[in-house]
């Protein structure tokens, strides 16, 4: 198998809910590992990863709202420019949608802790903020290389989003 064929097979398999849903929820172990490593190996408080207790729920909900606004804008722009269309379907499984939504919340939080909470702050503690943002943004983009449809434009968009998320975190000093 070539790398391209391997990625296609992995994408086909991982698209099945019985594989995808547990995979999304299991990313919480990446968060716990990053926290453990930060605390026990680097001897830094978890707070150094941007995990602020005060107002965490409010900040997290604001982050979700920002994400919904950004994704809605992308969707609407793609419809306006004829790239995608929106269709209403009957027989929607709202339970499955809720499971996926919860899974993507966990997976998104895990990516934040790994790439911005841990990696960006670890690099930033020894080097400039610009280098820390650049390294964590590029790592974030490359971590999605096995995603279906990944190409140079997808990498650029992921890196740009990661720069935005990094600057947002640096401005608020809060991962939530």
Predicted segments, located by residue:
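Structural signal for the C-terminal ends of transmembrane alpha-helices
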Residues: 36-45, 168-171
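Juxtamembrane helix-loop-helix connectors linking adjacent transmembrane helices
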Residues: 2-23, 44-110, 120-125
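Alpha-helical transmembrane segments of multipass membrane proteins
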Residues: 1, 26-36, 66, 70-74, 76, 105, 137-146, ...
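Membrane-interface helix/loop boundary segments of multi-pass membrane proteins
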Residues: 110-135, 167-174
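Functionally important transmembrane alpha-helices
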Residues: 154-176
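Membrane-interface helix caps and helix-loop-helix hairpins in membrane proteins
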Residues: 83-90, 143-152
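Small-polar-interrupted transmembrane alpha-helices in polytopic inner-membrane proteins
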Residues: 71-72, 104, 128-145, 158-159
């Amino acid at each position: 198998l070539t790398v391209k064929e391997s990625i296609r097979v992995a994408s086909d398999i991982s698209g099945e809910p019985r594989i995808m849903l547990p995979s999304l929820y299991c990313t919480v172990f990446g968060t716990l590992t990053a926290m453990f490593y930060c605390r026990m190996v680097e001897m830094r408080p978890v707070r150094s990863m941007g995990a602020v207790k005060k107002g965490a729920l409010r900040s997290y909900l604001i982050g979700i709202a920002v994400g919904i606004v950004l994704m809605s804008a992308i969707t609407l722009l793609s419809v306006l420019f004829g790239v995608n269309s929106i269709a209403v379907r009957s027989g929607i499984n709202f339970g499955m949608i809720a499971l996926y939504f919860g899974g993507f919340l966990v997976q998104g939080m895990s990516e934040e802790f790994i790439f911005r909470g841990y990696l960006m702050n670890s690099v930033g503690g020894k080097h400039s903020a610009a280098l820390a943002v650049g390294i964590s943004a590029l790592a974030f983009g490359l971590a999605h290389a096995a995603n279906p449809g990944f190409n140079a434009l997808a990498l650029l968009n992921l890196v740009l989003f990661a720069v935005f998320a990094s600057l947002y975190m640096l401005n608020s000093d809060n991962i939530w």
